[in-house]
Amino acid sequence: MMNFTLLTYLADCQPKVRSELEKFSKNLEEDIQQLREIGLDILVDGQDYRLVPMLPLLNPQQISTALFPYSIHYQPIISSTNEWILQNILSLKKGDLCVAEYQTAGRGRRGRQWLSPFAGQIMFSFYWAFDPKKSIEGLSLVIGLAIAEVLNVQVKWPNDILFDERKLGGILVEIANHKNGMLNLVIGIGINVSLSKQTEISQPYAEVCEIDPDVERQTLLPKLIQHLYTRLNIFEQNGIDEEFQQAWQSYNAFSNSEINVLTEQGVISGIEQGIDERGYLKVLCGNKIQMFNGGEVSLRKK
């Protein structure tokens, strides 16, 4: 288990003498090695140890105050925030969150691994419940739009967040097996804020620090969650109505673009026309509109 107390003491980027660090560690060399294995750079100069650059860890107490009455469960190092919510859902209320600095087994869409450098992203999952009689088609679009509105970036159907045509973040929605008469969901969100140069991601990616060099996760996180919950409450009342369709289209990275839709049956080309009241994608193919739902469908610009 990683020594988070030691990391917290090192996080300010100031040199720390070995004898001080040994108050927090029974085996300093082993603990330092574990920190390095998750991508942290710790310099050693004689008896002095220094973590570079400074690591701006989240302050869970301040976040809890900003998001009252929701409970914030701060798990600095965790396998998966979605998994934590799923395992603890019986003791949670709607809107309660799990927030992490680092995930060892984060998941993305279609079971892909979600890579998370330490304290370089906003990573959280929360519990939400819907009336089972109401449709939640288009839910991931609602989440994506809420994030795009706060960050002033773009969405790509069905659930990618883009800046400058590069992926800034992703969304994972899972159904929870919790028998309380509601449709129970775990919603996970990961957003790149400031990644180290050593981060190995196989596709072009963007970071919030490109948009706002002074960004602080501490203030951005509650702002995102508050707006997200506002959008979810509107969605519960109105669904994917005309107002939402227009708002989503205004942030759509592929609006009226020539695209290829990659399906299990093959590639379909056309011009993207936005979404309908179910959140389905509308594509003009020749003189006919074809509809696509999420599932195993991907989009590419031509």
From Swiss-Prot:
An annotated GO cellular component = cytoplasm
Which molecular function term from Gene Ontology is one that the record holds?
biotin--[biotin carboxyl-carrier protein] ligase activity
Q: Name the EC number(s).
A: 6.3.4.15
User: Is DNA-binding among this UniProt entry's keywords?
Assistant: yes
Extract one GO BP annotation from the record: regulation of DNA-templated transcription
Q: Which reaction does it catalyse?
A: biotin + L-lysyl-[protein] + ATP = N(6)-biotinyl-L-lysyl-[protein] + AMP + diphosphate + H(+)
Specify whether tRNA processing is a keyword of the entry.
no
In this chain, biotin is annotated as bound at S80, T81, N82, Q103, R107, G108, R109, K167
By its UniProt entry, which Pfam families does this protein fall under?
BPL_C, BPL_LplA_LipB
Q: Which family does it belong to?
A: Belongs to the biotin--protein ligase family.
Quote the function comment for this protein. Acts both as a biotin--[acetyl-CoA-carboxylase] ligase and a biotin-operon repressor. In the presence of ATP, BirA activates biotin to form the BirA-biotinyl-5'-adenylate (BirA-bio-5'-AMP or holoBirA) complex. HoloBirA can either transfer the biotinyl moiety to the biotin carboxyl carrier protein (BCCP) subunit of acetyl-CoA carboxylase, or bind to the biotin operator site and inhibit transcription of the operon.
Output the HAMAP family linked to this UniProt entry.
Bifunct_BirA
Protein's recorded name:
Bifunctional ligase/repressor BirA
Q: Which organism is it from?
A: Haemophilus influenzae (strain ATCC 51907 / DSM 11121 / KW20 / Rd)
Gene field: birA
